């Protein structure tokens, strides 16, 4: 009986170990030998999103292999985004591997894809094969390294996700390169997190350089603070043998030796990738052009990579020793040391309103920052009248550059009027609550924010004209799109059947258009949206013509290229497109001779068509 129990324990323990073992994946590039060079890794800060995988650098045409057996579950061919991309589902491990920017696919996949392209009469296709259509073995060729889509150099963008589309760190599965270099830290900031908070006497982020120490870095002198504050920093990782920079994957924050916060950038949902703008101090990053990562949690951040909230409560007269570990995926780390000294701000005592020449305000999350260019004497209060006509007196917080600064917590009530002794300023912003669906509506437009679109309460301006409208200003970015429905009945200037919205960050196209309204979904907030009409067709220019190949340059300066179709003797002819150089060419794998009547139709996103015809 005793031997049986020992055997049972051994079997259970063995199964437990096997369950904890990482899958034996092969590397997708040069799996048997060869030096691997990375130019990017998981968690790098990119515009508005985290980078979700590895960028592996090699010459164009390098074979790409499946890391494990499974089946092709998704294929997309596009000139944008991931370009030519293959998704392989691995049922045994509940993972999905992703291979993007391929120059071409393996012969097996190419035959399948080309058949679908001719079936749909389209270069761009997105296909979801059933599990039995395209089975894949470990180390099977699936394609070749390339530069398709939004790529600016030959490389493979490689990801590992869970079946539920959570992004994993591929470097946890492979020993890719030797690296003994720790992350770098370039600057730190301490930021006030409540209207009562101060850093170096002010309600604004205080930035400081760091100097090197045997442990890592140190801030030269103590930073005075009071109230709830957060630590931020500019950091990235480096590696031996490459000039590329990488993500600092882990951070741990301690106050007086006690850990209060950490993050590990892995295992986050792909659909929350844009929460990157909550991981960084979005406002400070826009002001400085540098990405200050937050070492504390913020409202609405659903990435799930954090432990603890990291916010530090600083009391008057107390001193706090702060340590921050920054670590890369290879376990190399260094530690920042700094001291916070608690210093309560002085209070101004007066019953009088301040006299001011100029009165203005800004909003930082839920804090209203009011600045009054004072007329001596510089002491005094301001009055805030709320929407319910309640009157509040707000004392001066501090002065800077001939201005008195006042701070008000907007969670106490929405202002209607801000008043000094000689100026009255209306508060015109609309409050958009987070955590629930909300609809803003005026004569010209409706703006719908779904639950989760905003990380925190927002205060926005809305302005509408017949040919444009403005939504601004927002301190934190949208996490998800907002839906705008615009009443265009008063617009007698433009025919909207061939119109779109132009924004400084991009273009938005009508999701719905009827006799009275149009609607769009957008993440381009804040900003000015202008209704723009496009009746000009794309241009088409023949670049090269041989018996084996046709090459065209195509383009559209307004709404942009939508799609194209080519026909040879009345039959669909597959062509390939690369938007980066605006070139369109006949499929190099076509075996039929290019002779007879040729017609190329190129459409823009407003439906304008340009036709090129010739006899080959």
Residue ranges and their predicted role:
Residues 4-13:
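Sec-dependent N-terminal signal peptides
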Residues 19-96, 103-108, 124-132, 137-138, ...:
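Surface-exposed, glycine-biased beta-strand/turn segments
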Residues 137, 178, 193-196, 201-345, ...:
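Long, low-complexity serine/threonine/glycine- and acidic-rich segments characteristic of extracellular
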Residues 225-230, 362-369, 477-483, 544-551:
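Short coil/turn motif common to extracellular beta-sandwich-like domains
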Residues 232-236, 368-375, 485-489, 549-557:
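Short edge beta-strand/loop segments characteristic of extracellular beta-sandwich folds
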Residues 332-349, 421-442, 612-616:
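Short beta-strand elements
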Residues 410-418, 518-537:
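C-terminal beta-strand-rich structural cap/linker in extracellular carbohydrate-active enzymes
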Residues 434-435, 454-502:
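Proteolytic processing hotspots in large secreted/extracellular or virion-associated proteins
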């Amino acid at each position: 009986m005793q031997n049986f129990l020992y055997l049972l324990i051994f079997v259970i323990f063995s199964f437990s170990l096997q369950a904890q073992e990482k899958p034996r994946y092969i590397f997708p590039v040069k799996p048997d030998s060869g030096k691997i060079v990375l130019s990017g890794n998981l968690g790098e800060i990119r515009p508005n999103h985290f980078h979700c995988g590895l960028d592996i650098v090699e010459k164009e045409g390098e074979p790409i292999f499946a890391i494990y057996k499974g089946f092709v579950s998704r294929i997309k061919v596009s000139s944008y985004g991931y370009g030519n991309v293959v998704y392989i589902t691995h049922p045994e491990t509940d993972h999905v591997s992703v291979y993007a920017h391929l120059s071409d696919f393996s012969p097996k996949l190419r035959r399948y894809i080309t058949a679908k392209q001719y079936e749909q009469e389209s270069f761009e296709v997105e296909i979801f094969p059933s599990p039995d259509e395209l089975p894949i073995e470990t180390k099977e060729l699936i394609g070749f390294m390339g530069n398709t889509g939004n790529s600016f150099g030959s490389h493979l963008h490689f990801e590992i996700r869970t079946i539920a589309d959570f992004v994993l760190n591929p470097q946890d599965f492979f020993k890719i390169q030797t690296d003994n270099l720790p992350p770098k830290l370039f600057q730190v900031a301490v930021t006030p997190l409540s209207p009562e908070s101060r850093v170096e006497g002010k309600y604004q982020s205080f930035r400081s350089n760091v100097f090197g120490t045997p442990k890592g870095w140190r801030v030269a002198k103590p930073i005075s603070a009071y109230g709830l504050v957060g630590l931020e920093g500019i950091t990235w990782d480096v590696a031996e043998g490459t000039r590329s920079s990488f993500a600092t994957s882990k951070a741990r924050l301690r106050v007086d030796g006690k850990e209060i916060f950490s993050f590990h950038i892995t295992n986050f949902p792909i659909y929350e990738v844009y929460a990157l703008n909550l991981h960084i101090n979005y406002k400070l990053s826009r002001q400085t052009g540098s990405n200050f990562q937050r070492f504390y949690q913020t409202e609405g951040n659903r990435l799930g990579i954090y432990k603890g909230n990291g916010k530090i409560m600083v009391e008057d007269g107390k001193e706090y020793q702060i340590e921050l570990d920054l670590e890369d995926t290879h376990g190399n780390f260094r530690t920042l040391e700094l001291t916070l000294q608690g210093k309560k701000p002085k209070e101004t005592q007066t019953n009088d309103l301040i006299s001011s020449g100029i009165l203005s305000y800004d909003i930082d999350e839920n804090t209203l920052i009011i600045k009054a260019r004072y007329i001596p004497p510089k002491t005094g209060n301001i009055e805030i009248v709320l929407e319910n006509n309640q009157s509040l007196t707000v004392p001066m917080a501090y002065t800077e550059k001939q201005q008195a600064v006042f701070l008000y917590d907007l969670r106490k009530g929405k202002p209607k009027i801000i008043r000094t002794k000689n100026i009255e300023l209306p508060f015109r912003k609309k409050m958009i609550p987070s955590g629930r669906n909300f609809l803003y509506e005026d004569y010209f437009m409706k703006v719908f924010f779904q639950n989760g679109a905003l990380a925190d309460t927002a205060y926005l301006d809305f302005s509408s004209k017949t040919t444009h409208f403005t939504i601004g200003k927002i301190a934190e970015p949208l996490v998800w799109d907002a839906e705008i429905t615009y009443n265009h009945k008063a617009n007698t200037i433009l025919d909207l059947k061939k119109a779109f919205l132009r924004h400084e960050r991009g273009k938005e196209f009508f999701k719905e258009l009827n006799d009275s309204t149009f609607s769009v979904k957008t993440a381009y907030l804040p900003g000015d949206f202008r209704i723009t009409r496009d009746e000009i067709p794309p241009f088409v220019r023949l670049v090269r013509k041989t018996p084996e190949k046709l090459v065209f340059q195509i383009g559209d300066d307004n709404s942009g290229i939508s799609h194209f179709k080519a026909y040879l003797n009345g039959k669909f002819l597959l062509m390939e497109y690369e938007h980066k150089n605006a070139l369109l060419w006949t499929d190099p794998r076509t075996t039929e001779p290019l002779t007879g009547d040729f017609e190329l139709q190129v459409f823009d996103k407003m439906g304008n068509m340009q036709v090129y015809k010739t006899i080959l």
